[in-house]
Amino acid sequence: MEKRNETGNNRLKRSNNRGKSKKDWKDASVETTPRETSVDEDNTSVFEDVEAQDSRQKRFSSTLEGNRFEELRSLREKEREVAIQNGLIDDPTKPRQLDEAVTFVGTCPDMCPEYEREQREYQNNLERWEINPETGRVDKNLAVKAFHRPAAGNEQALPSDVRPPPVLKKSLDYLVDKIVCGPDPLENTHFFVRDRTRSIRQDFTLQNCRDLDAVACHERIARYHILCIHQLCEKKQFSAQQEVEQLRKGILQSLCEFYDDLRKVKIRCPNEPEFRSYAIITHLRDPDVVRQSQILPIEIFDDQRVQLALRLSALAQKNNERVGHILPRNTEACPNLYTRFFKLVQSPAVTYLMACLLESHFMSIRKGALKAMRKAFMSAHANFPCGDLKRILHFDTVEQAASFSRYYGLEVSDDNGELSINLNKTAFFNDSKPDFRQLFSQTLVESKLQNRSFADIINGSRYNIDRVSPNTAFSTNIPLSLPFANKEPQPIAGFKKNTPETSVVSKNLSTFNGKFNVNAPVFTPRSFPTKPFSATDISSVQPTNLPNGSTNGTETFIPPVQNSITSNKEAVKPIKNKPKPISFESLSAVGNLIISDSLSRIVRQILQNLYTEWVHEKTNLVFATMFRTIFREVLLDGIASEVYLKSLKKHAISQISVRAHHSWVKKQEKMMLEMREKNRQEKYFSVLNSVVKAESSNITRLPIKRTFYGDTRNLDKASEKLRAEHDRTRRLWKPVLMDSLFSNLQKFPVYEDWHLLIFNASTSSMMKTWLCAKFSLKETNKTSFWHSSYNLFNRQYHVDMPDNVSDLPQTRLCYGACVYNVGLLDEEKRKDLANSDLNSSPKLIQGNDSRSAHESSANKLFSFVHDISRLTITKLPLLLIFWSDSNLDMQGITQKYRFLELITSTWSAISSIHVLTITNDRDMDLEHSLKVLLDNVTVEKSPFAQLEELEVVRKKREAEIEASSKTVKRLASNNKFLTDSNVEGLLEAPTSLENSLVEDDKWASLRQKIKAARDLLKKVETFY
């Protein structure tokens, strides 16, 4: 099978080679490494053709035993008729409207339908990854459905030929995990995976499946194609253009349509910004891409990846491209920011897949950069180093930069082992050639892979979707490097830039270091004549005009000066043999005079020009500064006036709107009160009528006289019932008089801020509302905290009800009492409480059992008590409220909720537990229960508060002992009469005092021992 594929590839090579001209072969030899052809290669190709024909003949002449293709083909039509009868597919003989079409649903459970497996095995059209190596036959667990191009003569697909979305996802997982990440390299499996993923997309299209499963599969397929564009760009059998077209028109276009359709049904795709950015990069130089991006939703358009792609698109625009029918149009006034483009690609903001897509545009951007550099550089400059070109355009090697330049006809020379390019306006540049082949970029693209596998890239690991930093992606402060390493010396101000005489003078002047020495040793330059200048000699020399140089309009002559001028006395020596016609002194005097006069005039003119330019610049600067200052003041005054008027209008409008809103709110409240009163009256009369009708229906027909009196009594009775019901409801929701209850606490020495804690453990909102009404609680700024306060006898009493204990202040407060609402106990829970055998059973309880809910309520109570014990200063009595339709077994309640353990635990701050069972409306009067609860208020400290006080006392005690020890040592060092034994005794006294204080923590003992320590210190001071 592999041999047949290789033969087909060789045929494709030869067919492509026949179409090439001699010029193309020559260009290909420059672009790539030339291949040597020989007679042996031709013989090999002929042998492969013969072998391919033999394999084709064997393939169609032999059949496998056990192949069911003929059997399945005979049953094909019957299966189609059954599918049409069952309404699974449309009948091709009966045309329908589009809205009446049958929704096609695939039923194939395997990665490849059975009919296709048998058919391709029969036709010997299997790939080696689909064949079981042990049996040599097709394997249903390895074969994947191939892509079938739709044509007019093809038969209609059956439901058994199409895979549903779960099977399609399974097939894609197999291709990624087993084929792409398998032992074979990516270039060998690309044709297989590309065909099978295309078949997956075809099955989604046949079923019109556009849900999240289809989106996820298309996203993974798109990532695979983007990965191949980079990884296989230099492979011979790979076509990057076809891959990009398949990605752009077949996958990304479908994904964009999926995103738009799902957004209409309020479904958000998390990876939409990522693939919108890929779509922008595939149309990098399309001027319409910005307009299409602006119609995206604001959250997609503002995403950092989309903004980064738009930034790259803006930097990739060119204005020097050759105009053609299929070529992208040039962008007017484009600055050709190619260096910023490559630096942004190299930054961490660009992900690996974005760099893979951008790699296909590198050569086009580099071509435009080369044309811009050629247009800007002059022929007088030296050749441009290939190393600098490699650095600016981010080639991997210098040889790549040289090959790229040779491809477009630029001359590349070797200067002492360093390659350089003749890059200027006069250099030849072949602009008609297509873009240079795509190169595998190691520095810009492959370095971003970061040791990740292909599966991580295709499946969209977090490394590939990192949040982009805004400062990195959209910063305009990208440092710009010079197009060459060293700058040429700038021309001296006052001279023309393009005149050769001026450049010569500037070069000659640059050789002088320091001041010009007129008294330097005399020499005879080679360019000077051996006799004095004459008028004819001077007139034959073309003078150089200084631009705006002299005020009198005269021309200044600049003699040529050699670069060999130096002040080294040893190198330049006067001529010993003086010529007789001209003396050495006269010649040197004339030369020095000419040089000094010329240079002095040049320097004077330069200084004058510099001074004039400096004065002009400073004048403009002062004028511009003064103008900006005046303009700024006028502008600020105007802005201030405008802002003041706007703010005044805004304030007036806001006041009017606030008053109008208050009036509207009052009107709405009045209307609500009227509506409530009206509804209450209507409800009252409706209940009254229903009661009257019910009573009237139970009375037999009597004479008219007795019926009249009977109706009157019924009305009175109904009115009494309604009044009694109203009184019962009022008593039920009547708030508790907390003032009278708190007044009984005056006999206790409680803290000034005393808190009554209410906690609702039930999930019923009605119970929570009832508790708020009974205790007159109001919601605070916190949404989960209700509070009310009372100021009695210079004490502040608070009633707090949080949703959770974590909503309470985390500082320790005085919670004097607590009301804990357990909630409603149904019949199953009461039976569970009464059943002692079940209570003591060690078996695990299921989560849906009533006992598990009861255990959960007991654990919740224990957790609540533990948290409150840490937050309260004093111990507190606890009132538990149970709701039930009958009396409870208190013994079972006590055992299940472990009241004894709650009271006797060392960490618990519960002083007593009281239980209130509400079975009817009369039990809802909480005044008696609260009075009993408040009568059991205690001032005893909680265990955690006691520990905190002991810790404070211990630290204070240690500080006093340490201070006393320091005092004793200080006195001992200052008193010579104290012996070592006395000092040791004085030092041991605080230690013994500390030990005794540790044993006895009573306050009286502590005071006595501290007093003894003070007396000891007084004795020491007296002795001193």
UniProtKB/Swiss-Prot annotation:
The modified positions for Phosphoserine read 841
* Predominant location category: cytoplasm
Q: Note the InterPro entries from the entry.
A: PCI_dom, Sac3, SAC3/GANP/THP3, SAC3/GANP/THP3_conserved
| Annotated stretches, region: Disordered | 1-62
The SS bond pairs are none
Basic and acidic residues bias locations: 22-38
Q: Which UniProt keywords apply?
A: Coiled coil, Cytoplasm, Nucleus, Phosphoprotein
Subcellular location(s) per record: Cytoplasm; Nucleus envelope
Enumerate the spans annotated as PCI domain: 243-433
Q: Which domain of life is it from?
A: Eukaryota
- Which PROSITE patterns does this UniProt record tie to the protein? PCI
Q: Which residues form a coiled coil?
A: 945-1022
A Pfam family: SAC3_GANP
Annotated GO biological processes are: mRNA export from nucleus; protein export from nucleus; ribosomal small subunit biogenesis
GO cellular component, as recorded? cytoplasm; cytosol; nuclear envelope; nuclear pore; nucleus; transcription export complex 2
The Acidic residues compositionally biased stretches are 39-52
Compositionally biased region (Basic residues): 11-21
The family assignment reads: Belongs to the SAC3 family.
What is the protein named?
SAC3 family protein 1
